[in-house]
Regions:
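N-terminal core-entry segment
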Residues: 1-198
Length: 199
C-alpha cells in the first residue's frame, strides 16, 4: 500500500505530514464532529464529511489540479446521493442504517477513482469493494456514545482502499447493490430501487 508511506497527507489545522489514509480519516472525523455538515435531502446523506477529506488527500497524492479535485468531488457527490436514494431513505433508516456511512464509501471510491484515473472496469470494482465494506448503525443513539464520527471516517478509508486496490488489480462485486445473495438493497432496505442509481 504505497500511499501509506508517511507523507502526502495533511491533517487540517496541524503541522507536518502523515500518510493520506490517516489524514483523510482524522479530517473526516473532524468534519462530522460538530454536526454542521451539509445534507442531501433526498438521500439524507452528509456527503462532504467523507468526500472532501478523501478527495483532498487523494488529490494531494496525485498532485491534481483544482479543477481535477472539484470534478472528483462532484463525481463523489453524485454517487453518494444516488446510492442513498436507491437504498430507500425511510426504510434504510428504520432498519438502523446510517446513510452517511453506508453510502459514503461509494462516494469516496468514485472521487478517488476519478483522481487515480481508473477505467470503467476498475471503477466498478472499486464501487463493489466500497459496498462490501459498507456499514454504519444508529445504535450510538441509545446511550449517547460519541462514535458517530467514525462513520464518515471509515467511509473515507473504505473508499480510498477500494480505489487504490482496484487500481492495483483487485476486483469487487459488480452487482453489490442488486445481487440476490448479499446485495445491499435487499439487506439494508425494504424499498430499495436500483433504478434510482441512474435517474
Amino acid at each position: 500500500l504505497e500511499r501509506n508511506n508517511g507523507t502526502g497527507g495533511k491533517i487540517w489545522g496541524s503541522e507536518g505530514e502523515t500518510d493520506i489514509s490517516t489524514a483523510a480519516y482524522i479530517n473526516a472525523m473532524l468534519a462530522h464532529t460538530l454536526e454542521l455538515d451539509d445534507v442531501h435531502p433526498a438521500s439524507k446523506t452528509h456527503g462532504s464529511a467523507s468526500l472532501i477529506p478523501a478527495a483532498w488527500s487523494c488529490a494531494r497524492y496525485v498532485h491534481a489540479s483544482g479543477k481535477e479535485f472539484l470534478t472528483a468531488v462532484v463525481c463523489g457527490y453524485e454517487t453518494v446521493s444516488r446510492i442513498g436514494m436507491a437504498l430507500g431513505v425511510t426504510s434504510h433508516r428504520k432498519k438502523g442504517w446510517h446513510a452517511t456511512a453506508t453510502c459514503g464509501g461509494f462516494g469516496c471510491a468514485a472521487a478517488c477513482g476519478k483522481l487515480l484515473g481508473l477505467n470503467a472496469d476498475e471503477l466498478v470494482s472499486a464501487l463493489g469493494m466500497a459496498g462490501t465494506q459498507s456499514f454504519g448503525r444508529w445504535a450510538f443513539l441509545g446511550d449517547g456514545s460519541t462514535c458517530k464520527v467514525l462513520h464518515p471516517a471509515r467511509a473515507v478509508v473504505n473508499g480510498l482502499d477500494a480505489a487504490f486496490l482496484a487500481k492495483a488489480g483487485m476486483t469487487g462485486p459488480e452487482h453489490i447493490l442488486e445481487a440476490e445473495d448479499g446485495g445491499l438493497l435487499a439487506a439494508m432496505s425494504d424499498t430499495g430501487d436500483i433504478a434510482k442509481v441512474s435517474k
